[in-house]
């Protein structure tokens, strides 16, 4: 069996199958809703590209790491390596912005949301997911309390 990866960089290895399947579900749900010009923030291993990109007129991805060589072979997909925020795109550029299991790792999360709003076309949509930090199935125990510095796990007013 392969090594157990964290949800930080999901792989298709058998030992990581639950996390992979759970993460892939977001891409399938988004694929039913998106169209036009799409930006993905936090492409990671890129497993969602083959699900979502065929539904987009243009598909641009941004990740802090360079894409794996096999990902760059996808036609009609443009890769950008950058730390966000900011987003290096013109205002009103995208019909949809998607970002799955990423925002909890962005220190300037409020600024990122402002940037997403800026690059979305009028009427555009931001589809975002973040893990439930009390999820006992999360493969990295520290992440259950480390997401958003543990504040997400605390009840309001605690």
Which residues fall in each region the model found?
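Conserved N-terminal segment of class I S-adenosyl-L-methionine
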Residues: 1-90, 96-100, 110-113, 146
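Active-site micro-motifs of SAM-dependent methyltransferase domains
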Residues: 86, 104, 135
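Residues lining the SAM
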Residues: 100-103, 129
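Transmembrane helix irregularities
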Residues: 102, 120, 148-149
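Di-metal (Zn2+ and/or Mg2+/Mn2+) metal-binding site signature of metallo-dependent hydrolases
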Residues: 105-109
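A short glycine-rich, Lys/Arg-flanked "PGG" loop and its adjoining helix->strand segment in the class I
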Residues: 110-125
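Conserved class I S-adenosyl-L-methionine
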Residues: 127-152
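A SAM-dependent methyltransferase catalytic signature shared across enzymes that methylate proteins
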Residues: 156-158
């Amino acid at each position: 069996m392969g090594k157990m990866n964290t949800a930080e960089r999901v792989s298709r290895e058998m030992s990581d199958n639950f996390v992979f399947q759970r993460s892939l579900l977001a891409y399938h749900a988004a694929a039913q809703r998106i169209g036009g010009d799409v930006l993905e923030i936090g492409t990671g291993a890129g497993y969602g590209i083959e699900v979502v990109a065929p539904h987009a007129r243009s598909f641009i991805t941004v990740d802090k790491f360079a894409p794996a060589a096999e990902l760059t072979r996808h036609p009609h997909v443009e890769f950008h390596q950058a730390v966000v925020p900011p987003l290096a795109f013109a205002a009103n550029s995208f019909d949809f912005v998607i970002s799955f299991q990423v925002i909890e790792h962005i220190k300037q999360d409020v600024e990122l949301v402002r940037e997403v709003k800026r690059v979305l076309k009028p009427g555009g949509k931001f589809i975002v997911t973040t893990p439930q930090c009390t999820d006992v199935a999360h493969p990295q125990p520290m992440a259950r309390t480390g997401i958003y510095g543990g504040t997400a796990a605390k009840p309001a007013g605690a």
